[in-house]
């Protein structure tokens, strides 16, 4: 079964045929592609046409969804988009608190992981006293809501802290302190006196702390908590995060592969940063569950591999979970394709530590626009040997030429591509580096110049998609006459056996795609 990341193409020296470079290894891909360099046209769109298994892809402009969603749906995928600020009802909804495993030993850990991403959206650390205290408060508040409140969501948490029905703050903490989170006592919780209790111990402990600390400190903690929850006070964000049409575990465990397009629009992407960081971190955490040993091999608990295709990766700020995950998520069926503009952008976030670069087995470089990236690429590409000749002419005794002529030949090393050559790299070209192999000098793919890709990109995207966790079918949207005519035109072309085969197999048999691990150095 072929499920490939398409990263470029190269000319076969033997017969001058174009071969597509694909990567189906369990390792990760890092791309250096400056703005307006054609990364969508040459990397993202082709990969979405060729990757057969589950995928979650960042899609700020929603162009990936519009160009590839219908093709992936026709190929048997469950397709949807999560657009936190969507107002037209087309977005799937995702409530992060639904990821908390209630009535299990994991509930506290799940709540802490969620709230850590909320209180530290800039990845500055938890050293600040009020930040760490608000983390403690929000963790308890999340647990209280999933066990006892009707609106068990992050918007519900935000509303709780600002609820005008509480005459005093003390009433807020008393409600948490006396709530019955486990009415049947099935969890075996005990209070500080070792007596059975129906109130979650973490919730009770935090409520007591909030009641006992000085008023000024309590006010600062509460203000910090309200501030970090401010995003979820937006009615649009609240509407799209109050319930769940999918859980992140569904991406790898459904009967059918899932294609999920994450759409933090250009207008809202900065303020959506806490939600974006939370979303990606939960995908990793909830899909790296313990594996089982079967017949002498460790087997992951998933039905489909997952490609995490994240464009403008450094814009998420420093995400230590992704930095660390590069070393282990491949064993859980997760493959990452991280795209950044250049090395400078990556180093501004992660410093000189090159763990991101080192953690990606394949690196793809388009022509850089800054010298730091060009210098690093010069080092990565290595050296070659060039032959040089020097001629010297000896003079006769009276100083006239005409004596002996000698030729000296020597070999010297030089960079295979210098900084200047990198900076002048053609807009049509790219270079792929594969660990422990020579680099490949290739050509960029242009999806619209590949007939099948061009036809697929014209398929009209789904206006709405059936939720993974709700059997109710979405209402169809009105279709214009022009759009209906285009759909009929494309539908006719899809009726041919060849085209239907292409759609059904997602390129599995149509193209002879060269595996990228079969490499050749510069010719």
Task: Describe the residue ranges of each PLM region.
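P-loop NTPase motor domains
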Residues: 13-15, 22-334, 347-352, 420-441, ...
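C-terminal alpha-helical "lid" subdomain
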Residues: 446-448
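Glycine-centered flexibility sites
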Residues: 5-8, 33-38, 382
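Single conserved hydrophobic/aromatic residue that forms the stacking wall/gate
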Residues: 1-8, 13
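Short, flexible active-site loop motifs that bind/organize anionic cofactors or intermediates
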Residues: 1-2, 312, 364
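Structured loop/turn residues at beta-strand edges in well-structured enzyme cores
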Residues: 7, 24, 358
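Conserved ATP-driven motor cores of ASCE-family P-loop NTPases powering translocation/secretion/packaging/pilus
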Residues: 326-328, 332-431
């Amino acid at each position: 079964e072929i499920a490939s990341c398409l990263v470029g193409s190269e000319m076969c020296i033997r017969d001058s045929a174009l071969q597509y470079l694909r990567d189906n290894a369990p390792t990760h891909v890092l791309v250096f592609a400056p703005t307006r360099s054609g990364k969508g046209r040459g990397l993202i769109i082709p990969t979405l046409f060729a990757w057969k298994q589950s995928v979650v892809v960042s899609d700020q402009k929603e162009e990936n969804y519009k160009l590839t969603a219908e093709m992936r749906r026709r190929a048997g995928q469950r397709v949807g988009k999560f657009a936190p600020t969507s107002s037209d009802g087309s977005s799937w909804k995702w409530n992060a608190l639904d990821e908390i495993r209630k009535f299990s030993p994991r509930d506290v850990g799940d709540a802490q992981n969620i709230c850590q991403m909320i209180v530290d959206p800039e990845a500055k650390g938890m050293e600040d006293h009020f930040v760490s205290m608000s983390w403690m408060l929000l963790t308890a508040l999340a647990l209280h809501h999933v066990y006892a409140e009707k609106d068990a969501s992050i918007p519900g948490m935000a509303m709780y802290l600002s609820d005008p029905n509480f005459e005093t703050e003390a009433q807020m903490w008393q409600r948490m302190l006396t709530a019955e989170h486990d009415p049947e006592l099935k969890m075996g919780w005990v209070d500080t006196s070792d007596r059975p209790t129906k109130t979650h111990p973490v919730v009770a402990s935090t409520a007591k702390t909030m009641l006992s600390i000085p008023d000024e400190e309590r006010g600062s903690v509460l203000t910090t908590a309200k501030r970090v929850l401010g995003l979820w006070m937006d009615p649009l964000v609240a509407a799209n995060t109050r319930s769940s049409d999918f859980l992140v575990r569904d991406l790898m465990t459904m009967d059918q592969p899932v294609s999920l397009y994450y759409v933090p629009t250009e207008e809202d992407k900065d303020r959506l940063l806490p939600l974006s960081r939370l979303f990606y971190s939960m995908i990793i955490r909830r899909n790296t569950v313990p594996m089982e040993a079967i017949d002498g091999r460790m087997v992951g608990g998933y039905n489909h591999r997952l490609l995490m295709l994240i464009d403008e990766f450094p814009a998420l700020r420093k995400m230590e979970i992704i930095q660390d995950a590069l070393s282990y998520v491949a064993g859980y069926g997760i493959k990452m394709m991280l795209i950044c503009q250049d090395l400078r952008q990556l180093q501004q976030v992660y410093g000189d530590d090159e763990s991101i670069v080192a953690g990606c087995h394949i690196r793809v470089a388009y022509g850089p626009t800054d010298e730091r990236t060009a210098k690093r690429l010069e080092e990565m590409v290595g050296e070659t040997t060039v032959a040089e000749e020097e001629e010297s002419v000896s003079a006769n005794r009276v100083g006239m030429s005409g004596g002996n002529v000698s030729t000296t030949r020597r070999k010297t090393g030089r960079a295979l591509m210098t900084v200047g050559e990198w900076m002048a790299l053609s807009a049509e070209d790219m270079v792929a580096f594969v660990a422990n192999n020579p680099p490949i000098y290739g050509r960029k793919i242009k999806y619209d110049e590949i007939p099948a890709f061009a036809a697929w990109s014209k398929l009209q995207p789904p206006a709405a998609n059936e939720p993974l966790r709700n059997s109710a079918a979405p209402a169809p949207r009105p279709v214009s006459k022009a759009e209906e005519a285009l759909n009929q035109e494309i539908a006719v072309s899809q009726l041919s056996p060849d085209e239907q085969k292409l759609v059904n197999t997602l390129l599995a048999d149509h193209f002879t795609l060269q595996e990228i691990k079969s490499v050749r150095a510069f010719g």
